[in-house]
Curated annotation (Swiss-Prot):
Catalyzes the phosphorylation of mevalonate (MVA) to yield mevalonate-3-phosphate. Functions in an alternative mevalonate pathway, only present in extreme acidophiles of the Thermoplasmatales order, which passes through mevalonate 3-phosphate rather than mevalonate 5-phosphate. This is Mevalonate 3-kinase. It catalyses: (R)-mevalonate + ATP = (R)-3-phosphomevalonate + ADP + H(+). It comes from the Archaea. Belongs to the GHMP kinase family. It holds the Pfam family MVD-like_N. The keyword Transit peptide does not apply. One of its GO terms (molecular function) is kinase activity. Optimum pH is 8.5. Substrate binds at L19, E140, R144. It comes from Thermoplasma acidophilum (strain ATCC 25905 / DSM 1728 / JCM 9062 / NBRC 15155 / AMRC-C165). GO terms for biological process: isopentenyl diphosphate biosynthetic process, mevalonate pathway. The keyword Transmembrane does not apply.
């Protein structure tokens, strides 16, 4: 049977062991191990939607605007799987359309993973880890969104592999409150290109691997607090190194909020994560989520209640 299109959905991500440094701009293989979670809101409305469809010429659309895709990453993945499209659609020529909804950060992972979900929907016997390796051309941490829950992407700088550590159900007693600030984001490539200049980078690579192994141990006993406490420690190390090479992600009001969170911690547990953008993500036990969400002074940020969710998925081809 010949189809005309397939749609898919994937969810954005938050780093837990933060990634800094890629091997090269083409394969985007990470230089060291990292970890992350996929997130959305209570009804799954924070997401990336993708449609791949047969066409007379290839067009690539992001949020309704056609892109030249100058780095050719999406086009490269579509070309790589042209035989899959030919088998399903009767033609190798396809177009791609992606739309993001409410994403705070991690949209590249979601966009890449939604491509992977569509490809796997058309050819289920493909190895998802092989597909993930190709998706890295779009986003180096695409596996976080492709597999969902809590994942670790093990990497030695030459080869990378994403391992699913915990399903989202393991986090059912926890919520994440996002505090979104209106600061300009540092592009991920600025971080990747600068952090490797630090004299502390070799130690950072070692610590990231150690943190990932510790998270895997915490996961064995469902020590969710241990995982997020370590994520906060990782955030603090990571951004200290970035400041040392002139990349300041945590701006004034973000730091004020972080200081306030540490005061709140005397009353009830919380742990924060800052990745490369202008958001402070705060893990908290669900019983205290409303208390955290209702704090009056957010230092100019907007709040959003989040939860950890599963991997990317596809619809029935049409």
């Amino acid at each position: 049977m010949t189809y005309r299109s397939i749609g898919s959905t994937a969810y954005p991500t938050i780093g837990v062991v933060l990634l800094g440094g890629i091997a090269n701009p083409v394969t985007r293989t990470p230089l060291h191990t990292s970890a992350g979670i996929a997130y959305s809101d209570s009804c799954g409305s924070i997401r990336s939607e993708t449609r791949i469809y047969a066409d007379e010429a290839t067009h690539i659309y992001f949020n309704g605007t056609e892109s030249t895709d100058d780095n050719r990453s999406v086009r490269r993945v579509l070309d790589r799987y042209s035989s899959v499209f030919e088998e399903a659609f009767g033609t190798k020529t396809v177009s791609y359309s992606s739309q993001n909804f409410g994403i705070l950060s991690g949209s590249s992972d979601a966009g890449a993973a939604s491509i992977g979900a569509a490809i796997l929907g058309l050819k289920p016997d493909l190895d998802p880890h092989d597909v993930e390796n190709d998706l890295r051309a779009v986003s180096e941490s695409a596996g976080r969104s492709l597999f969902g829950g809590l994942t670790i992407t093990w990497s030695d700088g030459f080869h990378a592999y994403t391992e699913k550590i915990l399903d989202p159900e393991a986090f059912s007693g926890y919520s994440i409150v996002a505090f979104a600030f209106d600061y300009q984001r540092n592009p991920s490539d600025v971080i990747h290109q600068n952090i490797v200049r630090s004299d502390l980078y070799p130690a950072r690579k070692k610590h990231a691997d150690e943190h990932a192994h510790m998270i895997k141990e915490y996961a064995k006993t469902n020590d969710i607090k241990g995982i997020f406490d370590l994520a906060q420690e990782d955030t603090e190390e990571y951004h200290s190194i970035l400041r040392g090479v002139g990349v300041n992600v945590i701006r004034e009001n973000m730091q004020k909020l972080i200081s306030y969170l540490k005061l709140i911690r005397k009353d009830y547990w919380n742990a924060y994560i800052v990745t490369g953008g202008s958001n402070v993500y705060v893990a908290v036990e669900s019983e205290n989520a409303d208390r955290l969400f209702s704090i009056e002074n957010t230092f100019g940020s907007k709040k959003k209640m989040l939860r950890i969710v599963g991997g990317a998925w596809h619809r029935r081809p049409e």
